[in-house]
Amino acid sequence: MKPLNIIFAGTPDFAARHLQALLNSHHNVIGVYTQPDRPAGRGKKLTASPVKELAVANNIPVYQPGSLRKEPAQQELAALNADIMVVVAYGLILPKVVLDTPRLGCINVHGSILPRWRGAAPIQRALWAGDKETGVTVMQMDVGLDTGDMLLKTYLPIEDSDTSASLYEKLAEQGPVALLQALEGLANGTLAAEKQDEALANYAEKLSKEEARLDWNKSAKQLWQEVRAFNPWPVSYFEHQGNTIKVWQTQVSETTSTAAPGTIISASKKGIEVATADGVLTLLSMQLPGKKPLNVADILNARGEWFSPNTRLANEAQ
C-alpha cells in the first residue's frame, strides 16, 4: 500500500496514542493540528497538549489555530496538500470547507459503537447506562456531531470491574489498531461506508460535578454504574458530617432492606452498606477531605463514629 500523506488533529493523551501509531506506520504525518497551549497546574503555566509534545519530539510541524472557521487557517491547511486528515479528540469544529479539503476527506476515531453515544463523553456514558459492550468507530466526518458514515467498528465487552479509567486504557489500545485498518481499507478502496441509523442515535453529554452527587433515591445498581462512570473524574460523592466524601468503588449488595434511602445498614471492614430506593449499595473505597482514597477498613479506623448503623447519609432529595 502506498503511504498516505496525513494531517493529524487531536489534543489529549487518547489522541497522542493514535498519533504514535501513525508515526510507527509507513504513512507520512505531514502536519499536526492541536488546541492552543492552555494554563495548567497550580502555577497556571501555559502547557502544550500531549499531541503537541509528541509532534515536536518528532519534528513534525504543529498548527494551533483557535478556530478553523477563518480563511487564512483554511488556506494554511489546504497548502499541506494532504491525502487525508485523521481527527481524534481534537476539540475544534471542522467546517465543511475543511472536511472537503483532503483528497480522502477527514476521518474520526470515536470511543463508542455509533450511532450510540455520539458526543463528548461516550466512554463514561456507556458505563453510566449499564451497557454490556462498547468499542471504537472509525467514521468519515460530515458537518454533524459524530453523524458521519461508519467505516469500521471494533467491539469490547464491558466488565463489572471496569471504570472510565480502565475503559479509556482499553479503547486507547483498540483505537489505533482500528485506525490503521481503516486507512488501509480507504487507500485500497475496500471499505464500504455504512450510514448511521438515526433511530438508534443518542447523545453522550459531558459530565458535571453536580451529577456526581450520589442520590440514594436511585437504585443500588444505577449508583454502582455511576461510581464506575465517574472514576477518575469527577468522582462520585456525598455530603456527611459537613464534609464532602468521595466514593471510588462500590458493589451491589445481596442484603435487602426496608430502611429509608441513605440509611447505613451495617459498617465493617468488608464495606459500609447503604440502603437505596432499590437494593443496598456497599461502599468499598472512599476518600475523606484532604486525604488519599482508602479502603473502608481504614476509613472506619479513622472515622468510625461517622458511619454507625442507622445513621442517615445526606441526600439531594431529603
Swiss-Prot record:
The keyword Chloroplast does not apply. GO terms for cellular component: cytosol. PROSITE patterns: GART (PS00373). Keywords: Protein biosynthesis, Transferase. Transmembrane segments: none annotated. InterPro entries: Fmt (IPR005794), Formyl_trans_C (IPR005793), Formyl_trans_C_sf (IPR037022), Formyl_transf_N (IPR002376), Formyl_transf_N_sf (IPR036477), Formyl_transferase-like_C_sf (IPR011034), GART_AS (IPR001555), Met-tRNA-FMT_C (IPR044135). (6S)-5,6,7,8-tetrahydrofolate binds at residues 112-115. It is an enzyme of class 2 (transferase). It catalyses: L-methionyl-tRNA(fMet) + (6R)-10-formyltetrahydrofolate = N-formyl-L-methionyl-tRNA(fMet) + (6S)-5,6,7,8-tetrahydrofolate + H(+). One of its GO terms (molecular function) is methionyl-tRNA formyltransferase activity. Its EC number is 2.1.2.9. Belongs to the Fmt family. PANTHER family: METHIONYL-TRNA FORMYLTRANSFERASE, METHIONYL-TRNA FORMYLTRANSFERASE, MITOCHONDRIAL. Attaches a formyl group to the free amino group of methionyl-tRNA(fMet). The formyl group appears to play a dual role in the initiator identity of N-formylmethionyl-tRNA by promoting its recognition by IF2 and preventing the misappropriation of this tRNA by the elongation apparatus. This is Methionyl-tRNA formyltransferase.
